[in-house]
């Protein structure tokens, strides 16, 4: 059982005194009511339902981060679906709709008052069991954010985030990928009217802004996968009570897992979202098992490993991810640019092979006895071209993933998040 509250230390490493944080979440002790932490960093603001949409907040929820180099303390109660929002060079605008429901900043709506600001967030859930945190790139990448979680015994886990100039690297690499294949990766790079780089969108967010983006992109690859598994089994280790399940393409049409259900061919939009087409709308009586299978299929499509490995996710090696010409190059580039190679780049980036003792790709930190989470806004390291992802000698590296006997690492695997109200892999 965790303490009723935990402590966050927010470090302003931006070089600017015009930086703010916001904390939102769902109150686990009050039927998931939406809450903010107020500007003092400790008082909970629980908005009431307004009479009209787009109503202003009744409290100041902008937490000033102070002068460059300063640290601000924040007290966090048990929350699900939490986000720590950061902005530099202004303040974010949050409003309320009846419910109440928080209207959050948008990166896909140019009419949103926050669209032209430099902002980003990390995600967390703090419940009776643990504090679980990640840097999310599922929607976009913008500001450098780093995590360091210290537990009650003094042990630390960390995620280093993108380096100084990391967003510029991401933009350059996306534009270079478009120059190589003409697929539209450059359209993920977002600049304001003056040409200032604001952020890079994920392919899924890019398709929200432009529904035709990447149309047909995965078509030939999916056809090749279907042809391969018309002649051999695809084995998926569910890493759960269902064990290994075998799939085979039948009638040239669907990938069938027998009595468990089938998957039609996914489109690029389905693959990038991980939640539409064959990866969503499961029959109620099979939702759990198909959600599990769908998570592993979606991860393998994003990483483009299905033609290389007929046993998913077992046998997967990080070095084999994103090696095909058709792949999620946004995810590839994010992992290349991050200092330690870790960060949630698509909704099921937490899928890993059983027995994998390497640090997770998703860039999570979690502990059942958290003492202090330090979240640094602004890079901890200077720019490099992706750099050496190995920890330097003497550094306190994040240990490998804790496992239970089924090989499921002790976080919230993507489909479990959705079922339990977790915050990870949202878009």
Predicted regions and their residues:
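Extracellular low-complexity, O-glycosylation-prone Ser/Thr/Pro/Gly-rich "stalks"
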Residues: 2-427
């Amino acid at each position: 059982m965790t303490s009723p509250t935990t402590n966050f230390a927010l470090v302003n490493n931006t070089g600017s005194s015009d930086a703010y944080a916001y904390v939102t979440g769902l109150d686990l002790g009050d039927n998931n009511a939406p809450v903010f932490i107020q500007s003092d960093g400790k008082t909970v603001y629980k908005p009431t339902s307004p009479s009209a949409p787009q109503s202003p907040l009744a409290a100041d929820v902008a937490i000033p981060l102070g002068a460059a180099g300063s640290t601000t303390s924040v007290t966090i109660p048990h929350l699900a679906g939490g986000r720590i929002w950061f902005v530099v060079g202004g303040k974010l605008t949050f409003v309320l709709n009846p419910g109440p429901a928080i209207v959050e900043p948008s990166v896909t709506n140019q009419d949103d008052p926050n669209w032209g600001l430099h902002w980003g967030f990390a995600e967390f859930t703090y419940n009776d069991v643990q504090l679980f945190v990640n840097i999310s790139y599922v929607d976009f990448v913008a500001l450098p954010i780093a995590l360091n979680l210290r537990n009650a015994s003094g042990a630390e886990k960390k995620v280093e985030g993108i380096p100084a100039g990391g967003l510029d690297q991401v933009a350059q690499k996306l534009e270079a990928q478009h120059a190589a294949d003409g697929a539209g990766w450059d359209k993920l790079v977002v600049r304001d009217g003056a040409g200032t780089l604001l952020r890079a969108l994920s392919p899924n967010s890019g398709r929200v802004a432009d529904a035709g983006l990447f149309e047909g992109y995965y078509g030939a690859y999916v056809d090749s996968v279907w042809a391969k598994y018309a002649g051999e089994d695809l084995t998926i280790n569910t890493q759960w009570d269902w064990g290994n399940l075998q799939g085979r393409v039948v009638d040239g049409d669907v990938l069938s897992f027998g009595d468990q259900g089938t998957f039609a061919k996914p489109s690029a939009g389905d693959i990038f979202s991980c939640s539409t087409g064959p990866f969503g709308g499961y029959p109620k009586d099979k939702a759990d098992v198909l959600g599990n299978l769908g998570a592993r299929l979606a991860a393998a499509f994003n990483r483009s490993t299905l033609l290389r490995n007929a046993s998913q996710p077992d046998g997967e090696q990080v070095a084999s991810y994103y090696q095909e010409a058709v792949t999620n190059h946004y995810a590839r580039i994010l992992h290349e640019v991050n200092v330690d190679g870790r960060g949630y780049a698509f909704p099921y980036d937490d899928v890993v092979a059983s027995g994998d003792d390497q640090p997770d790709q998703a860039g999570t930190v979690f502990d059942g006895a958290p003492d202090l989470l330090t979240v640094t806004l602004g890079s901890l390291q200077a720019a490099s071209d992706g750099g050496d992802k190995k920890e330097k000698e003497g550094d306190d590296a994040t240990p490998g993933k804790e496992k239970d006997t089924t090989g499921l690492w002790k976080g919230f695997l993507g489909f479990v998040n959705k079922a339990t109200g977790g915050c990870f892999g949202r878009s």
